[in-house]
Amino acid sequence: MDRAEKKESVAALADVFQKTSVVVVAHYSGLTVAQMQNLRKQMRASGATVQVAKNRLVKIALDGTPVSSISPLLKGPTLIAYSDDPVAAPKVAVGFAKDHDKFVILGGAMGTTALNVDGVRSLATMPSLDELRGKLVGLIQAPATKLAQLTTAPAAKLARVFGAYAAKDDAA
C-alpha cells in the first residue's frame, strides 16, 4: 500500500468514525476465510459493516472522532465492526462470538462512551431501533382500538336487542 492509498484509507475510516453510532473491536485470529465471509454476510444482513485495516491507520483515523476511546484496543489482529443502528453490530458480533471461540470481542464505543466487553454484550441484548418502533406503534394503537370497541359496543348491544325482539315477533 503506497502513501496515497494510506491517506485515502485513513480519510475513509475517519469519515466512518464521524458518522457511525457504534463501533465494536474484536480479535479474529484463527478464523477461516469461510468463517470471516459468514461474519461479513451476517453483518451486511443486519445493516452493519466489518472491516480489517492496519491498526496504525485506524489509530490515525480515530484522532478527533467521537469513538477515539477504542484506540487502546487496537493491538494484534483486530477488526472493526460498525453500524448506524446502535444495536446491529454488537448483536451480530456477540452472536458470532458465541459460536466461534477464536472470535474475541475486545470492546467498543457508542458515541463518546467507551464500552468494555460487558458493555458490548449488554448493548447486544437490547432491542433494535425497528423493534422499538414496532412496540411503540403497538402501544399507541392499543388504546385507540379499545376506544373504538367501547364506542361501538352500545350500538352493537342495541342491534342485538332489536334482533331478539324481531326474532320473538317472528316466532309468535
Curated annotation (Swiss-Prot):
Pfam short name (any one): Ribosomal_L10
A GO cellular component annotation in the UniProt record: large ribosomal subunit
GO MF terms, alphabetically ordered: large ribosomal subunit rRNA binding; structural constituent of ribosome
Keywords associated with the record: Ribonucleoprotein, Ribosomal protein, RNA-binding, rRNA-binding
Keyword Ribosomal protein appears in the UniProt entry: yes
Record-level GO BP terms: translation
InterPro entries in the cross-refs: Ribosomal_uL10, Ribosomal_uL10-like_sf, Ribosomal_uL10_bac, Ribosomal_uL10_bac_type, Ribosomal_uL10_CS_bac
SUPFAM superfamilies in alphabetical order: Ribosomal protein L10-like
Family annotation (CDD domains): Ribosomal_L10
UniProt keyword rRNA-binding, yes or no: yes
NCBIfam families xrefs: PRK00099.1-1
Family: Belongs to the universal ribosomal protein uL10 family.
Subunit structure: Part of the ribosomal stalk of the 50S ribosomal subunit. The N-terminus interacts with L11 and the large rRNA to form the base of the stalk. The C-terminus forms an elongated spine to which L12 dimers bind in a sequential fashion forming a multimeric L10(L12)X complex.
Stated role: Forms part of the ribosomal stalk, playing a central role in the interaction of the ribosome with GTP-bound translation factors.
Protein name (Swiss-Prot/TrEMBL): Large ribosomal subunit protein uL10
